[in-house]
UniProtKB/Swiss-Prot annotation:
This is UPF0102 protein CBUD_0259. PANTHER family: UPF0102 PROTEIN YRAN. It comes from Coxiella burnetii (strain Dugway 5J108-111). It comes from the Bacteria. InterPro entries: Restrct_endonuc-II-like, tRNA_endonuc-like_dom_sf, UPF0102_YraN-like. Belongs to the UPF0102 family. GO terms for molecular function: nucleic acid binding. Pfam families: UPF0102 (PF02021). Transmembrane segments: none annotated. Signal peptide: none annotated.
Length: 120
């Protein structure tokens, strides 16, 4: 049994996935977990692997959902993505980027490509 918060999160991820597929991305997997991190969606954009954080806010009058991705969350996303790349033996074999999709209660979607910069 899922909590209301989890159901809202799943719906936001489903909405984001459909939106991104309409934009030309291909679905690979969802909810990839490693230790304290989770990547909501992993998709491909032509030959690039895209790690996607989906954020939903019911009340976005004061802060947009995209702005809620903290530096700590960014570090966890990067560590989890590195684990994914190592697990699938893709490290140094494929280009990747980190995108954020923000969704508001009125279903407005904001997609920011390369939202998180990673230094190697």
């Amino acid at each position: 049994m899922f909590s209301l918060t989890q159901k809202i999160g799943f719906n936001a991820e489903k909405t984001a996935c459909r939106y991104l597929q309409k934009q030309g991305l291909s679905f690979i997997t969802k909810n990839f977990r490693y230790k304290q991190g989770e990547i909501d969606l992993i998709m491909s954009d032509q030959s690039m692997l895209v790690f996607i954080e989906v954020r939903y806010r019911r009340f976005s009058d004061f802060i947009h959902p995209v702005a809620t991705v903290t530096p700590l969350k960014q570090r966890r996303l990067i560590k989890t993505a590195l684990h994914y790349l190592q697990k699938h033996r893709l490290l140094d074999k494929i280009s990747c980027r980190f995108d954020i999709v923000g969704i508001t209660a009125d279903r407005q979607i904001t997609w920011i490509k390369n939202a998180i910069e990673v230094e190697y």
